[in-house]
Amino acid sequence: MSAAKRDAQSLFPLFLKLSGRACLVVGAGAIAEPKIEGLLVSGAKVRVVAPRASSIVERWARAKRIVWRRRVYREKDLRGALLVIAATSSKKLHARIFRQARRCGILCNAVDDPPHCDFYYPAVVRRGAFQIAISTGGLSPALAQQLRKRLEREFGPEYGAWVAQLGRARDRLRKKNLNAESRRETLHRMAAGAVAKISRHRIHAPR
C-alpha cells in the first residue's frame, strides 16, 4: 500500500468549532476564495496574506469580514493562528508554509498538494445543523464533489428542520425528571421515528 493510500485510510474525522478563532489563508485568488468563504461561514476570524486579491476577496476586506495583509507571506503571519490554508499556485511556497506551520504546531492545508496537508477539506452537504461530510483523503476530490451533488438532491432543507425539531425535544427531555436510561430510550425512539419519517419522505419525493 502506498503512503498516500495509507494516510487516506487513517484520517481522523471531526467537526471543528472555529467561531472566533484566528485562521490564516495565504493567497487571495480564485483558489483561495472558497476556502476563505468556508471559514467565514464557520465564524472564524480570517486573516489573508497576498500581494493581490480577486474582486470578491477585496470586497470582503472592504466590508471588514476579513483582514487582508497586502504583501507576500512571512513566517510571523502564523502567530496566533489555529490553522493555515496555503492557497497559491506555488508548490515551493506551500512546502515552506507547511514546514513552518509544523514547527509552530499549527495545522496546515495546502490546496491540491496532499503531501503538505495535515487535513483535507471534505465535500459537505449542509442542511442547518444536519451536515454530511464526504472525504476521499485527498485521493479524488472530484469524486467527493460528485457524491456531494448527488446527496444534495436527495437531502433537502426539510432534513435541517427535522434535526432542529429533535434538538428541541432533547432540550425538553433534559428538563424532565427522568433517569438517564429512560431519557436515552426516549431519545432513541424519537430518532427512530424521525428516520422512518425520512424514509417515507424519500420514497414519495419526486425524482
Where are these regions (language model features)?
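Short loop/edge segments at beta-strand edges and connector loops
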Residues: 50, 68-72, 112
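Residue-level detector of alpha-helix initiation sites
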Residues: 30-31, 92, 138
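An accessory alpha-helical subdomain
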Residues: 138-207
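Hydrophobic, well-ordered beta-alpha structural blocks that scaffold small-molecule cofactor pockets
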Residues: 1-60
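Hydrophobic beta-strand scaffold residues
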Residues: 46, 68, 107-108
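Glycine-rich, highly charged phosphate/nucleotide-binding loops
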Residues: 59-79
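ADP-ribose/adenylate-binding Rossmann-like module
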Residues: 83-89, 94-121
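E1/E1-like adenylate-forming module used to activate ubiquitin-like modifiers
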Residues: 110-160
